[in-house]
Design a protein with these regions (language model features):
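A broadly conserved sequence feature marking short terminus-proximal activation segments
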Residues: 2-31, 134-135, 195-198
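Acidic, metal-coordinating catalytic segment for phosphate/diphosphate chemistry
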Residues: 24-72
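Short secondary-structure boundary/capping segments
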Residues: 27, 73, 160-164
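Short connector loops at helix/strand junctions that flank enzyme active sites
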Residues: 50, 65-69, 81, 93-95, ...
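Beta-strand scaffold of nucleotide-dependent catalytic cores
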Residues: 71, 84-88, 148
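Conserved hydrophobic "DFG−1" position in protein kinase catalytic cores
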Residues: 74-75, 86, 151, 173
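Conserved Nudix-box catalytic region and its N-terminal flanking loop in Nudix hydrolases
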Residues: 76-121
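Unchanged
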Residues: 105-195
Length: 198
């Protein structure tokens, strides 16, 4: 620039440079830390796990209700004995663990439909929702409510071949009780083998 002062902008960080220690850091998201109605942060909670929570800004009370999970108990008549269909998980939680087929109940979904849907999604085995009957309902300490649906027994030869799905490496038959990936699955399977869900 002729006869004028040249002004330079402040230095710009190159990709890979460390941010300045005084630069504002992004906020870490904390689940359930703000009111779902107005967005104000919850303040003056007696503890991080205190529920229900009332927003001091808008007065709305929030509850942390259990997440319902539908789990299938499908008896299979094998050549020597009768067992239950189980899957091997390929996703977290408990990736690599053996479990009963199951998953979260969708919004406005009937629990019997959820049992049949989860069985199909995780094993490829079709079942009619109207054939599902309540075997048990159990709660865990993580805030889940597991609803175990019992289906009529089927011969092993009538099932489709076991193939991997989006969440499992396929299905297998459990012929005796043993520890499963989730304690409540272990409890429900043991109860079935003991004759309490037949």
């Amino acid at each position: 620039m002729r006869g004028g002062t040249v002004r330079y902008s402040p230095p710009v960080s190159e990709p890979g440079d460390s941010p300045s220690p005084t630069a504002p850091q992004p906020l870490r998201y904390e689940r359930n830390s703000h009111c779902g109605t107005c967005g104000a942060p919850y303040t003056a909670l007696p503890s991080a796990d205190a529920w229900p929570r009332t927003c001091t800004h808008c007065g709305t009370t929030a509850y942390r209700n259990p997440l319902p999970v539908a789990v299938a108990l499908l008896p299979v008549i094998g050549p020597r004995s009768t067992g239950l269909v189980v899957i091997t998980r390929t996703i977290e939680p408990q990736k690599g663990g053996t479990a009963l087929p199951g998953g979260f109940i969708d919004h406005a979904e009937d629990w019997r439909h959820a049992v049949a849907r989860e069985l199909r999604e995780e094993t490829g085995i079709e079942a009619a929702a109207q054939d599902v009957r309540l075997a048990d309902a159990l709660s865990d300490t993580d805030g889940h409510l597991l609803v175990f649906g019992l289906l009529p027994a089927r011969p092993l030869a009538s099932l489709p071949p076991s193939t991997p799905t989006d969440e499992t490496s396929g299905y297998d038959i459990l012929y005796s009780p043993r520890p499963l990936a989730f304690p409540l699955h272990t409890e429900a399977a043991a109860a079935w083998f003991a004759g309490r869900h037949r």
